[in-house]
Every structure is written in structure tokens, then in C-alpha cells.
Amino acid sequence: MYFGTDDSHLHKEISLARNQGYQILNVSYGSLPENVKGDRAKMEQAFELALKHTEQFLQNVDWHSYGSILFISKSIGTIISSAYASRHDLTVKSILFTPLADTFSFSLAGSIAFHGTADPWAETEIIQKLAQQKEVPLFLTKNANHSLETGDVLTDITILKTTMERVERFI
């Protein structure tokens, strides 16, 4: 299951999960507030709206009919997927791409995370500390932004390959 605002960022990761036999559900959040960075009230509003849409979208899913549940999420989606799993007492495997600090306020057993050290949305030191506290394996990508990209195409291709290999091993 993919939690994010734009599935184009994780198309290859979703394809890996599909190839491993996972059914894919792309959770859509509808319209969220803009310009939320640095505005705690807007961030909380975005979270509440996204979680509400997620609850509605997934209300008829029979989680007990699945042998294994994998959540793939990015950015705000990491908070939403973690909150949803917690609310519904689900045992899931989670791949957290560019998680925000609030993601780590939930149980994250069975998760791995990927973070770029130049991510303007989450400070590396904070993410490292929180991941260590929750015992979440964290893969850092040096000089990468919130999309795990550096701006150098060849470097980004190498990053993508390394990331995909790690994701495939995890799945």
C-alpha cells in the first residue's frame, strides 16, 4: 500500500512490491493545505485531513484477509501510514521515505527509513536520533534532498539503484 501525495516519486518501489505479490492500493488525501512548512497549525490540519481521507478510503479493507501488509510511504505519508497502523493495531512492514520527525511518535517495529542529509523538511540529527530510539534501520543519503536526489543525474541514478536494492531485500 502506498501512502503519499504523488505516486510518481515511488513508482519503482511500488513496482517492486507488486512484483513480490503485494496488492497495491494508492491512498489519496484529496486537497491539503499549502505552504505548511514551518507552520505547525497548518501541518496538523494537513495531517488531520489526510488521515480522515485515509480512514474513508480504507474503511472496507479486511486487513485480516492479508498474510502480509506492506506500507510504502513518503513525507507526510510516513506519519499517516504510521498513525493508521497504530489506530487499527495492524502489524505491518513499512518503508519510510523521507520521514518527518512526527512519524517517530508511533510504533515503527518492522520499518526501515531513507533520509537525505540535505532534506529541508527534516533535520538529519533529529531523524537519526529518533530512528535509533525506535530501532528503525535508517539509510542516509549524503547531500540528498526530500526526494533523495542531489541534482547530479549520475549520482542520483546510483542512489536510486542502491535504494532499490535495499528496498528489494527488505520486501
Indicate residue ranges for each PLM-predicted region.
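Catalytic histidine-centered segment of alpha/beta-hydrolase-like enzymes
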Residues: 144-159
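Active-site nucleophile loop of the alpha/beta-hydrolase fold
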Residues: 1, 29, 95-103, 116-118
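Gly/Ala-rich beta-loop-alpha elbow adjacent to hydrolase catalytic centers
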Residues: 69-82
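A conserved short beta-strand
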Residues: 88-101, 110
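Conserved loop-alpha-helix segment in the C-terminal half of the alpha/beta-hydrolase fold
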Residues: 123-136
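Short beta-strand/loop motif that positions the catalytic acidic residue
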Residues: 107, 112-115, 119, 127
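Acidic catalytic loop of the alpha/beta-hydrolase fold
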Residues: 117-122, 146-147
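Serine-hydrolase catalytic machinery in alpha/beta-hydrolase-like enzymes
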Residues: 1-65
